[in-house]
Every structure is written in C-alpha cells, then in structure tokens.
Amino acid sequence: MENLEIVFEPLPGEALTRLVTDNVIGVNFAKTGISTWHSVGYFLRSARGEWLGGLTGYVWGGWLHVNFLWVSEPLRGHGHGSRLMDAAEAFAVERDAFAATLETHSFGAHDFYVKRGYTVFGRLADYPPGHTKLFMRKVLGSITG
C-alpha cells in the first residue's frame, strides 16, 4: 500500500472542504438513494456592508441541519435570529424537509430554540467541562410519501 501522509490544514479552504463534502454525499447517496443536498446560508448585512450575523447549514434527507447561528451581540433580542431561522426553515420546507436539527450548549441559546418549537432529544455532559451540549429538533411539516 502507498505511504500516505496526513496533512493538517487549519483553514482547509473551499476546494478541500468540497472534496470531503462531495465524497460524503456520494457515499450517502449510494447507501440511501438520496442525492439532493442543499447548502444553507443566510446572513445579516448592514447598509454599510458590515456582516452582523448569519446562519449556515444544509438540507439533506428531509432534514434541515443548522450548523451555526450567530447574531452580533448588540443586535440580539431584536428578532434577527428568528428572521434567519425563519428563512432557513422556509428554504428547507420548500425542499421537502419535514424536520430540523441543531446543537447548542447549556450556556447558549437553548431558550431561544425552545421558544421556536425545538425540543431536546439528547445531552452530552461536560462538553465543554462544566457544561452540556444539547441536541435539539423540531418538526417542520409532514412526511410526504
């Protein structure tokens, strides 16, 4: 077997990220027959062009997965996070998603997500130490067959 080198890339860039993503999608398609994968990215931009918040994730297999949601501290509590979530959830439903999932932490936005209809289905203690990682989900619509 060929001698392969493991290379650390702290900022892998789009090409390497795409290499891994495309190959995982290919394996998932081979196992499930589901080939559609939609990246999700909604962002808050000021009139001056400043980026002040955003949401990233993807839709696959009937689910929206929210990777990250962030709103600049001074803008929190003014509905911007809800607007970003609304946009992502609508995007997902338009692509036949019936549910959404995300992770947050006990020190994070748990209450925000509960108000939006998300429920905790799993917990990982001491992630990081002294805190809990929360796995949450929400039904967006009906499963259609």
How would you label these PLM feature ranges?
Residues 4-67, 72, 107, 126, ...:
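Acetyl-CoA-dependent GNAT
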